[in-house]
């Protein structure tokens, strides 16, 4: 199973719709998502299909986690014996939410990549039209045991490695990236983060949302480079 989050534009979004047969498609309507509460409601209404946690406990991070962790039952209900492929499309071009809320929403999506990694093939597409010149940069969820394979796959690229095991503060995380990578080379960049549990629930959510925002908006969107980020668990 694999999980990825890819930056695309609206033209690529149109092409994406041509290849969705047999997949569970979740579309998040940014026009209806003004804050993180709206986002939580939108994503929960899509994935909470087993025990209806949202009505038992309300719409929050913990209900979202509990609903997502029912991945085995979700596969049986929606796919049976067929391959379980899920596509989430979120057009976030207008950046309506506050920066803090956007960071939390990215943390939700990254957590889903980890929680569903053993049962479902998850492809997340964030649509950011007219906000970057370079598209198809992405975040890939993988296992730490595959680190050597990743090195071989990405050789001859600008590779940066960072272990997050002792990293609990977003400020430290951001400073280490800014100090070690200037994104001035023309070659593709590959960022590898070991022990990426901080993005799921390893640290305070306010720190995690700042880290997630750094990866998606500051790096994937604003650097205008072809970038691939591996979050290893």
Question: Which sequence ranges carry the predicted segments?
Answer:
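N-terminal intrinsically disordered, low-complexity segments enriched in P/E/S/T
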Residues: 1-55, 59, 63, 71-233
């Amino acid at each position: 199973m694999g999980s990825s989050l890819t930056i695309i534009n609206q033209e690529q979004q149109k092409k994406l719709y041509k290849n969705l047969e047999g997949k569970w498609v979740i579309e998040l309507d940014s026009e209806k998502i003004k804050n993180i509460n709206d986002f939580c409601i939108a994503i929960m209404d899509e994935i909470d299909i087993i025990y209806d946690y949202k009505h038992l406990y309300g719409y929050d991070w913990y209900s979202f986690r509990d609903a997502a962790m029912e991945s085995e039952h979700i596969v049986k209900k929606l796919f049976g014996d067929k391959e379980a492929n899920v596509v989430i499309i979120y057009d976030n071009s207008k950046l309506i939410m506050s920066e803090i809320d956007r960071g939390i929403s990215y943390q939700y999506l990254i957590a889903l990549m980890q929680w569903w990694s053993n049962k479902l093939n998850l492809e997340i597409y964030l649509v950011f039209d007219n906000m970057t010149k370079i598209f198809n940069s992405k975040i890939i969820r993988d296992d730490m045991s595959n680190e050597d394979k990743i090195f071989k796959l990405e050789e001859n690229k600008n590779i940066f490695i960072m272990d997050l095991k002792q990293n609990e503060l977003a400020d430290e995380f951001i400073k280490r990236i800014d100090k070690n990578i200037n994104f001035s080379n023309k070659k593709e960049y590959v960022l590898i983060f070991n022990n990426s549990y901080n993005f799921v629930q390893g640290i305070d959510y306010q720190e995690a949302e700042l880290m997630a925002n750094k990866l998606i908006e500051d790096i994937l969107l604003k650097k205008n480079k072809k970038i691939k980020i591996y979050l290893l668990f």
